[in-house]
Amino acid sequence: MACPKKKTSKSKRSMRRAAWKRQAALQAQRALSIGKSILTERAQGFYFPEAEEENEDEQE
């Protein structure tokens, strides 16, 4: 026969929520840092293609 599970305490719930929010804030900070480096053209850790539309106009 199925028995009901015990209720999760408020402290455990708040600890899990705080850990989740901490991880989300760290990811947001990293994304903002990458965006800033792309805008200032100082990004060296990854490759992103140049705009192809400009090259097509020059060839015609």
Swiss-Prot record:
Q: Name one GO cellular component term.
A: large ribosomal subunit
Composition bias type Basic residues, residue spans: 1-20
What is this protein's record name? Large ribosomal subunit protein bL32
SUPFAM superfamilies on file: Zn-binding ribosomal proteins
Gene Ontology MF term list:
structural constituent of ribosome
User: What UniProt keywords apply to this chain's record, in alphabetical order?
Assistant: Ribonucleoprotein, Ribosomal protein
- Name the family the entry cites: Belongs to the bacterial ribosomal protein bL32 family.
Is Hydrolase found in the keyword set?
no
Query: Does the keyword field hold Ribonucleoprotein?
Result: yes
Q: Which organism is it from?
A: Thermosynechococcus vestitus (strain NIES-2133 / IAM M-273 / BP-1)
Q: Name one GO biological process term.
A: translation
Checking Pfam families in the record gives:
Ribosomal_L32p
> Which InterPro entries does the entry mention?
Ribosomal_bL32, Ribosomal_bL32_plant/cyanobact, Ribosomal_zn-bd
Region annotation (Disordered) ranges: 1-22
Tell me where on the tree of life, at the top rank, the source sits: Bacteria
